[in-house]
Amino acid sequence: MQASDTPTLTIHQAPHGRGLAWLAAGWSMFQRRWQPLAVLSAGLLILLWLFIPRASILVPVLATVYLGIVAAWCRMARGGEVFLAGSGAWKNPALWALAIVVGLASLAQLMLVGAIGAGAAMQGMYSAAHIGKGLFYAFAAAQLLVWLALSTLWLAPALVVERKIGVVRALGLSVAASLRNPLPFLTVAVLGALMLLLSMLLLGLGLIVAMPVLACAAASAADELLA
């Protein structure tokens, strides 16, 4: 899964307030040429609506491919090119390999959190109430930590599509760049999660805006942190 010709990339440290700047850049990119992104986002939401009840593992898979396509769109928009399905970005085998890896990682997350939750439920049934409550908090903390760990993969799709690097290296660089820039990363992760939650209140229609804004923010962050 490694590319044969991989460029040398350096991880840069961004100022603490850059997380907000990346989100602002994502909003600016969306405003510049929002129609294809809205269509792409609506198409993804329809696919998720059709397949989520039967195969939830497709959610992170399709989300990863979506991030890669939007990264290609951002590059094309900056160059004034016409966007046609990411000019084949969705056919990139490395992007799909990355998506499968992320999907398997997400499945492992669900299994881990589910096992912890089952343990907490059993302890809550057969132990004192305060022990059950403590395990519930442990379950919530574990879920939060695993979500943050998966969130460090947010830069990988742009690296695979735009930098033409291998899947394993892209994952490593994404995690390393996120950990080297914890405050900007957490800013995007927390505000992004809030944006997605608020968007769902409008029957999910707000996701047509929130999703591309966050994807463009990820592409902007990848361009800045890894050069």
Residue ranges and their predicted role:
Residues 1-227:
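Hydrophobic alpha-helical membrane segments
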